[in-house]
């Protein structure tokens, strides 16, 4: 059934508040913590072995054992981060930076994908007989803001968003497909 939304119901969510919430969510999970899950530690170990030259870049492994995940790009991103890191920086933190960017990218792609989907004429709310319905742009922004908030809520339940594992890269690239 079509939505019945007034212009007042589609008022803008403060952009700074949404960006601040997304930034806090991204940074709080990556900054000031050590790897605490075995999958996180294995991924960091594989990246470290790639940097040290102990493993082949096309067949990442940890102590001779092949990686559990058949993904290459996430390990490469972390290893490249480790390679370009200054000597004074913590290697595990630098390996997390590409994953922080992937999570931010997933949030942006979700917002824009939902925004463009909600701007479609078939997704617009019912037009009122005497006006007052939500404008397409405002309605799409409200739906996209809600979509990102729901996305963050679901990520909080899944607990994969703050790991340095291929699952986060899969999430980021899936969000790109959605966009």
Where would I find each of the regions flagged by the language model?
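Membrane-embedded alpha-helical segments in integral membrane proteins
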Residues: 82-83, 150-159
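Helix-to-loop transition at the C-terminal end of transmembrane segments
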Residues: 24-43
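Hydrophobic alpha-helical transmembrane segments
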Residues: 38-52, 100-103, 142-144
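Transmembrane-helix motifs of polytopic, lipid-linked glycan transferases
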Residues: 97-136, 148-153, 176
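Start-transfer (signal-anchor) and selected internal transmembrane alpha helices
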Residues: 1-27, 140
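Specific aromatic-rich, kink-prone transmembrane helix
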Residues: 156, 169-179
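Extracytosolic helix-loop segments that constitute the early lumenal/periplasmic catalytic or substrate-binding loops
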Residues: 25, 43-69, 73-76, 80-83
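Loop-to-helix entry region of an early transmembrane alpha helix in multi-pass inner-membrane enzymes
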Residues: 72, 76, 85-113, 137-145, ...
């Amino acid at each position: 059934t079509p939505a019945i939304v007034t212009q007042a119901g589609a008022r803008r969510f403060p952009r700074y508040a949404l960006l601040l919430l997304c930034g806090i969510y991204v940074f709080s999970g990556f900054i000031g913590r050590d790897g605490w899950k075995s999958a996180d530690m294995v991924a960091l170990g594989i990246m470290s072995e790639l940097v040290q030259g102990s493993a082949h870049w096309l067949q990442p492994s940890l102590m001779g054992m092949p990686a559990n995940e058949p993904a290459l790009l996430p390990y490469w991103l972390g290893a490249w981060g480790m390679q370009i890191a200054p000597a004074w920086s913590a290697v595990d933190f630098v390996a997390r930076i590409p994953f922080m960017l992937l999570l931010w990218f997933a949030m942006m792609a979700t917002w824009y994908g939902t925004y463009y989907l909600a701007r479609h004429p078939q997704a617009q709310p019912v037009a009122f007989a005497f006006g007052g319905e939500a404008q397409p742009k405002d309605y799409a922004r409200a739906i996209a803001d809600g979509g990102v908030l729901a996305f963050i809520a679901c990520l909080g339940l899944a607990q994969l968003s703050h790991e340095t594992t291929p699952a986060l890269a899969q999430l980021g690239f899936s969000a790109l497909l959605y966009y």
